Amino acid sequence: MESVPGDYSKRVYQGVRVKHTVKDLLAEKRSGQTSNSRLNGSVSSSQSPFVQMPGSPVTSGYYGVRRSFLSDSDFHNSKQFSNDVYTSSVGKPFPCESSAGQSHAALLEPYFPQEPYGDYRPPALTPNAGSLFSASPLPPLLPPPFPGDPAHFLFRDSWEQTLPDGLSQPDPVSADALLTLPPSTSCLSQLESGSIAQHRGSSWGSSLAGAQSYSLHALEDLHHTPGYPTPPPYPFTPFMTVSNDLPPKVGPLSPDEEADTGSLHDPSPWVKEDGSIAWGSYECRRAY
C-alpha cells in the first residue's frame, strides 16, 4: 500500500507539471492567434501560419506570440530594408577593414620587427648564460674530477677553515694520503675513495662538532683514541694492509662499527662502494 501513493504522487506531480506547461503554451498560442486576428483582420489569417510554422508546434506557439507583432507589421518592409542594408554594407566594411589593417601594420612595424624576440633576446641572454654557466667561476665551487689536482686541496682547505682546529688538523694528512695513491687503482676507485669519502668525512666532522648527532661514537672514540696509530705515517696503502689488524686495537665495538669492520675484512668491496664509507668513518675518528 505504501508504494501506490508514492507512484501516484510522482505521476500526479509529473502530470501536473507537464500539463501546466502545455496549457500555458496553448493559451499563449491561442491568445496570439486572437490578437493577430483582432489587430490585422484578414492579413493575420494569411501570415500567422507562416510565423508559427518554423519549429515544433510547442515552440512555434511560444515564439510566435513574441514575434508576431514585428513580423506581421514589418515583414514586407523588412525584406527590402534588409536588402538595402546588406548591399550597402558589403561595399563599406571591406575597405575599412583593409585600411585599418594597413594602418595598424604601418604603425606597429617599427615596434614589432619581423622576428620580435629572436633578434635581440638571444644576444642578451647568451652573455648572461656565459657568465652564469661558463666553466670559469665554477671550478672553485665544485671539486675537480680527479683528487690529484691541487685545486681540490685548496677547495677542501677553504671548506675546513670554518671547522674547529681539532677537526681541521688531519687536512695535510689526507692530502698526503691522496697524493700517495697507488697507480694500480683505477680512476673510478680514485673518484669514490678520494672525493666522495673526503666530503663525507668533512660533513661527518662538521655534524659531530655542531649537533653532536653521533654522541655515542664520539665518546667511544675519545676513550679509544690512544689505541689508534698516529695519522701522519699512515697513507692510503698501509691502511689497506693494516685493515686486518684494526679490530683487536679498537676493543669492544657497537653493532654499527662491527658492520664497518666486516666490510673492511673483504678487500674486493673496498675498491668499489664500501671503501668510501669505511674510509670516511676512519677519517672521522682520526679527527679526534
Swiss-Prot record:
Signal peptide: none annotated. The keyword Isomerase does not apply. Expressed in tuft cells of colon mucosa, as well as in small intestine and thymus. GO terms for cellular component: cytosol; nucleus. Transmembrane segments: none annotated. One of its GO terms (molecular function) is POU domain binding. PROSITE patterns: OCA. Residues 10-32 form the OCA domain. It holds the Pfam family POU2AF2. Residues 24-52, 247-274 are annotated as: Disordered. Residues 35-48 have a biased composition (Low complexity). It comes from the Eukaryota. It is found in: Cytoplasm, Cytosol; Nucleus. Interacts with POU2F3 (via the POU domain) in a DNA-dependent manner; this interaction recruits POU2AF2 to chromatin and increases POU2F3 transactivation activity. Belongs to the POU2AF family. In the N-terminus, possesses a conserved OCA domain for bivalent binding to class II POU domain-containing transcription factors and to an octamer DNA motif (5'-ATGAAAT-3'). This is POU domain class 2-associating factor 2. The gene is POU2AF2.
